[in-house]
Amino acid sequence: MVKKLYIKTNGCQMNEYDSSKMAEVLYASHGLVKTDQVEDADVILLNTCSIREKAQEKVFSQLGQWREYKAKNPHVLIGVGGCVASQEGSDIIKRAPFVDIVFGPQTLHRLPALLNERLEKNKSVVDISFPEIEKFDHLPAPRAEGPTAFVSIMEGCSKYCSFCVVPYTRGEEISRPFDDVLAECYQLASQGVREINLLGQNVNDYRGIMDNGDIADLALLIHYIAAIDGIGRIRFTTSHPLAFSENLINAYAEVPELANHLHLPVQSGSDRILSLMKRGYTALEFKSKIRKLRKIRPDIRLSTDIIVGFPGETDKDFQDTMDLVHEIGFDTSFSFIYSPRPGTPAANLPDDTPMEIKKQRLQILQNRLLMNAARYSESMIGSKQKILVTGFSKKSSQQLSGRTECNRVVNFDGPPHLIGQFIDVQISDALPNSLRGRLLEKEMQPA
């Protein structure tokens, strides 16, 4: 009988990538097949995120929901991975003794051995060490699951922003060797992948060693990936403005496969707050890089991350952020109210701004961003857009779905053979979270 694996993933795209690798490594080692139903699973994994407020309590709340299932099915193994696992370690076992395995982001490749150790010794096991880049050397060959794929090119972060736990949960920055990344991209392209998404906590700090001993930056890596037969689009996330180099800006002029969209977290428009955050740049320096980029790609769309209500944020600080949002014209943003993360410097800063004020500021910011997004979506009506068809629409199996270069979802009527192809559609309607399009006549016939 085939045994099954259920994975619940919280957090960022890096976690989504890590979860896919957990599934691959356990399929290769133990033949575990993924299921979307937790009640069908023989192994249950929770891949955690520590970015948002009360992350630890949310983990134990989820584990509490699985406790009864485990009691009724004692053969089921439960594992906790990700950043909360890295922070809490064996304390997870103390609070939830029914958990069998605790592992960190850098030790997911050891899951088969941890699983075997748990079964052999009949006691919980914990491995939250930081074995640098070792995990990539022990993962199975990548398996494409559609025309787009995520490729992790580096791990960790060395910026130590005052509000962020990533350096403590994922370790210092370390880049995968250049040729290892290229080999994975070649393998994925041979399996039908047409769009590569390069991942890292601070992806534009990539410094991969080449076979000749030279060091490749992200811009050079992008050039090489663009030359792979079949790869028609490249994206990368998440970037840090401090490391957004001239070489990377020039890549937008030199590599047409580089998507016409950039996610660049600014966090605040106030120099005072940016300094408290230890971001390492000013609002003017951020705007200068955007101006240079727009000289090369005038119509590039930008998204960002913004924290509202950072300790000590005044009305003027918030207005500086709103002014920057207006000037840059961000298309979308992941914006949220600051919450202190244990062990970070910002957690010790005095914070006397009432929560009600923080909520008001967040609402004002999000209203502006929604207005920006709606205005841009409406401006696309009637335009021809090149999209990569990724599959069927979530709402209707009678429609296809894909993404534009600027990362907008487009749903349209069309034949299934178009899945995995780049095609042109005309945008016919703008909805709050997606666009509707019409397939152009020349795309209707099979190739």
Swiss-Prot record:
Residue span(s) of domain MTTase N-terminal: 3-120
Domain Radical SAM core: 143-375
Cofactor: [4Fe-4S] cluster
Pfam families, sorted: Radical_SAM, TRAM, UPF0004
One GO CC annotation: cytosol
EC numbers, comma separated: 2.8.4.3
Annotated HAMAP family: tRNA_metthiotr_MiaB
Main function: Catalyzes the methylthiolation of N6-(dimethylallyl)adenosine (i(6)A), leading to the formation of 2-methylthio-N6-(dimethylallyl)adenosine (ms(2)i(6)A) at position 37 in tRNAs that read codons beginning with uridine.
Identification of the protein by name: tRNA-2-methylthio-N(6)-dimethylallyladenosine synthase
Organism of origin: Legionella pneumophila subsp. pneumophila (strain Philadelphia 1 / ATCC 33152 / DSM 7513)
